[in-house]
Swiss-Prot record:
Full protein name: Glycerol kinase
Gene3D superfamilies for this protein: 3.30.420.40
Binding locations of ATP: 11-13, 264, 309, 313, 414
Domain of life of the organism encoding this protein: Bacteria
Family under the similarity heading: Belongs to the FGGY kinase family.
Entry's EC annotation: 2.7.1.30
GO cellular component, one term: cytosol
Signal peptide extent: none
Control of this protein's activity: Inhibited by fructose 1,6-bisphosphate (FBP).
Matches recorded under NCBIfam families: glycerol_kin (TIGR01311), PRK00047.1 (NF000756)
Molecular function GO labels: ATP binding; glycerol kinase activity
CDD domains listed in its UniProt record: FGGY_EcGK_like
Amino acid sequence: MTYLLALDQGTSSSRSIVFDRGGRIRAMAQREFRQLYPQPGWVEHDPMEIWETQLATAREALAQAGLTASDIAAIGITNQRETTLLWERASGRPIANAIVWQDRRTEPLCARWREQGLADAVRDVTGLVIDPYFSASKIAWLLDHVPGARTRAERGELAFGTVDSWLLRQLTGGRVHATDTTNASRTMLFDIDRGAWSEPLLAALDIPRALLPAVQQSASHFGDTEPALLGHAVPVCGIAGDQQAALFGQAGFQAGLAKNTYGTGCFLLMHTGAQRQASTHGLITTAAAQVDSTAPRQYALEGSVFIGGAVVQWLRDGLHAIRGSGEVQALAESVPDAGGVVVVPAFTGLGAPYWRPEASGAIVGLTRGSTVAHIARAALESIAFQSAALLDAMSRDAVAAGGQPVSELRVDGGACVNDLLMQFQADLLGIPVVRPQVIETTALGAACLAGLGCGLYAGTDELAAQWQAERRFLPTMPRERAAERMARWERAVRQTVAP
């Protein structure tokens, strides 16, 4: 049994990937599921669709690999974080649809908590800010809007879980109600210093303790699957939220290692080791994957760009500049540079390190000679500019805490295959940008955690030696020129928030 099965449950689809012991992909299956928008600002998923698509892809991936469940050493789970489910403990029946991390319905409740002066306590205990993004307000909303839910929760009849807990419950036939440290750290209820649920916060936010799952380290034995599901019982030995799993899949095991996931948005995480670092630049302190119960707790700094690869979708669907996303690099490369054009894709405001929700998008520097190719190149460059500003903030936080600035950026996600973007990113940062051989790092991270949890791997040193780069993009732009480009970007950003 030298194969690992990663269940990668995302916001729009469920995927399953079979890895061999060397971290190579043997098979992959994927199924999309419905996005539900019952009211403006609301985003929901059907919990049973999440489960059914995930189980179907697991079976498909095994069949595609020509393997049976008895060939699998362990299962690892990685998941969209913060998305919230409540179900009946006895029957496993969900009492409502899952409220997705993107859902903003609980902003009035979060505003009330801020007015009550809870923001400092939440940041001190959890490392987070009070926001509908995280699970706590979603739990409270369900308790107050599903008839009888709060009373049943207080009696211990209901269970809360993020998506990993829900999948674990289904896989084990209801025997296990648990999560890992990384997912717990995204609920706004978890004390990341103590590694336990915060009783004072639970009381302040009026959330019953009886709802919550047990919390285990990310690489550990969570339980065994029901034999009938896959044809043989398989241990579940690894769980991590998607961004922490991606950092782990990038062999980000030590302080100072950083990764950027280029998806619809961009998610930048830097491992800070056993040191919890507070940010003065609008970043979030969160838990990194925990793999050794005898070692100190591990932490990370996290920041996100709202519009990353989505700017390419805008070029396609909004401007009709390209027919498909794969055309953007060729169009951008048809001109030597952006011709002074700067695109600031603040379509939904600006995230870290700016935190300007009122910002709106802008195209700056247009002249009579500007073409759609210049706009396409500027749009692509905007992904790198935003990531560079974020990494600069992260490095400043690291240095302020006595550490070192980031010296290398590991990249993954769909847009990392764009060589033009990756080279420009390296040029702006002045450090190597490294693309791994396996860019499915979220699933790989879950598989690696499962391999550690079941004893297939001896430790993270073995995994670090196994990680391989596909290409290193080295900076070629003079630093003075890079500074000029960043200064022009910052001037354009200021124009998007000008009164």
